[in-house]
Regions:
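Conserved SAM-binding loop of SAM-dependent methyltransferases across substrates and taxa
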Residues: 334-347
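Conserved class I S-adenosyl-L-methionine
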Residues: 324-331
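Non-catalytic accessory regions of SAM-dependent methyltransferases
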Residues: 69-214, 244, 254
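Conserved SAM-binding motif I beta-strand of class I
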Residues: 349-354
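S-adenosyl-L-methionine
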Residues: 358-394
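Mobile active-site "lid"/loop adjacent to the S-adenosyl-L-methionine
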Residues: 378, 395-425, 431
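Non-catalytic substrate-recognition/targeting regions of SAM-dependent transferases
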Residues: 198-211, 229-308, 316
Length: 497
């Protein structure tokens, strides 16, 4: 029996069974509804509740659940919760720090992390509007820095600079100049026409991602203040980048950069803007080049900005291990790893599987674009891997690159369980001595937690896993050490024995 919490361990030690406990689940749901509460230090798997849905480990024994409910009822009687209470709002006050610049915000506690959450804000200037650049003061009234303000977001302030640095046109141009300068130092224009120009917190521009695809700049926006200024930023970036250049031929669109703005619907709702209101100039699809492979990118309907530039270096490295190999690309999206393995690496065969039907269709187009044959399957990855295992199918190289499985801290346990299960299935499809590359793009999943899930998958299947490297995102995705989340991508290279 695989345990996820202390209750599983106690149940195992007591020899309890795994009988269904739906009635206990319903009773527990009825006891606590609404809000996010941390109720019992002994119930790690049930540390948080949201919208009345308990975070129960699947298969928890009836006796353990009953004991847990009793414990939580007693704990709950000691507190008076207000179910469904609204989240904290930033308080407005006319009494700011002495001599404060307007608009201002004063903090309860200061941090060098670029995110300042609502609970950290003591008071805000009534004149401060959503999206404004505000002067940020510490609790003693000293100027701490400047940031973008949005009282309706949980991230009330996104810090831009510390100390007395003014936020003016010169500031923005300097930041974009630093970002473009790094990409020039990396020599990316000589090897690809698809790379990340601005990496949000990694480039000290929290809330803004800019991707270059051919002659188009795609803006992915996470902050209202960035959305309000995106057209100015586009002009500044065009000045810094100069006219778009091609790897092998001039672009038909001419010397000017085209632009496109997109944002996740949930981000739009939280931050209070609509990307559709921005001018949309770019075509729905563009063709890019990377490592000699051509990819068609859907910047309108594709995931994120349409392509995963962060895996560029990992794609080439994997291709160099695929000469004459049978390759399985799990969660293949539009064929990034698989096509690079086939075209640049000389793989004997490539099979790609993904649940997104539109992505599979685009992967087929990309295979035709490169005049190669790959097998592409529209299926759920878990079901497909089980089917291949039942059929006795194995591969020389297996890539596991799922979408983000942990989007919030309350999803961490469930997301790690999915990583464990997916890797446990995939590792059984690797021939002895074969290679497996497994990835996580969830910033909330630490390196140790991810490695733990992989190690558990190996133990569960009886396969010895030899890690020969650990990599991350390509260098156009820099990491600021005061924001470890900017180093979100984890790529573990394994030899399966």
């Amino acid at each position: 029996m695989r345990g996820h919490c202390r209750w599983h361990a106690r149940a195992r030690n007591a020899g309890l069974g795994m009988a269904p406990a739906r009635a206990a689940d319903e009773r527990l749901s009825a006891v606590f509804r609404g809000g996010t509460q941390r109720l019992c230090s002994d119930c790690e798997a049930l540390a948080s509740f949201r919208s009345g849905t308990p975070r129960l480990c699947s298969g928890l024994p009836v006796e353990a659940r009953r004991a847990m409910i009793s414990c939580m009822e007693k704990r709950g009687s000691k507190h008076r919760f207000s179910p469904g209470r609204p989240r904290t709002r930033v308080e407005r006050s006319a009494d700011g720090p002495p001599g404060a610049q307007s608009p201002w915000v004063q903090l309860r506690s200061a941090t060098l992390h670029p995110f300042v959450f609502q609970r950290m804000v003591r008071a805000a200037d009534p004149a401060a509007r959503p999206g404004d650049v505000v002067a940020v003061y510490d609790k003693a009234g000293a100027l701490f820095g400047h940031g973008l303000f949005n009282p309706q977001s949980q991230i009330a302030i996104r810090m831009l600079a510390y100390g007395e640095t003014p936020i003016d046109e010169g500031f923005w141009r300097a930041r974009f100049g630093q970002a473009v300068g790094l990409r020039r130092q990396l020599g990316l224009d000589q090897v690809t026409d698809a790379y990340r120009v601005v990496h949000s917190e990694g480039d000290n521009l929290s809330g803004l991602i800019v991707e270059r695809y051919a002659d188009c700049l795609v803006f992915e926006i996470f902050a209202l203040g960035m959305f309000q200024r995106w057209s100015e930023f586009a002009a500044m970036l065009a000045d810094e980048l100069g006219p778009p250049t091609s790897l092998d031929r001039p672009y038909k669109a001419g010397p000017a950069w085209r632009t496109f703005v997109r944002a996740d619907a949930q981000i739009e709702a939280i931050e209070g803007f609509q990307a559709a209101a921005a001018q949309q100039e770019a075509p729905a699809r563009l063709v890019i080049r990377e490592h000699g492979v051509r990819y068609r990118v859907d910047i309108v309907g594709g995931h994120k900005t349409g392509f995963f530039c962060d895996q560029r270096d990992n794609r080439l490295r994997l291709a160099r291990l695929c000469g004459g190999a049978d390759v399985l690309d799990v969660c293949c999206y539009t064929g990034g790893f698989g096509l690079c393995a086939k075209v640049a690496g000389g793989a004997a065969s490539v099979t790609g599987v993904d649940l997104d039907e539109a992505a599979i269709e685009l992967a087929r187009e990309n295979a035709n674009l490169n005049q190669v044959r790959v097998d592409l399957v529209h299926a759920d990855a878990f079901a497909y891997l089980r089917q291949m295992q039942a059929n006795g199918r194995q591969f020389d190289v297996v890539v596991v690159d799922p979408p983000k499985l942990v989007t919030s801290r309350r999803d961490l346990e469930e997301g790690l369980a999915k990583h464990h299960d997916l890797n446990a299935l995939a590792v059984q499809l690797v021939r002895p001595g074969g290679i497996m590359l497994t990835c996580s793009c969830s910033g909330l999943v630490s390196r140790d937690a991810f490695l733990g899930a992989i190690h558990a998958a190996g133990r569960r299947t009886g396969r010895a896993l030899q890690m020969f490297d650990y990599t991350g995102a390509a260098p156009d995705h820099p990491i600021m050490l005061n924001c470890p989340e900017s180093g979100y991508l984890k790529a573990v290279w394994l030899r399966v024995l």
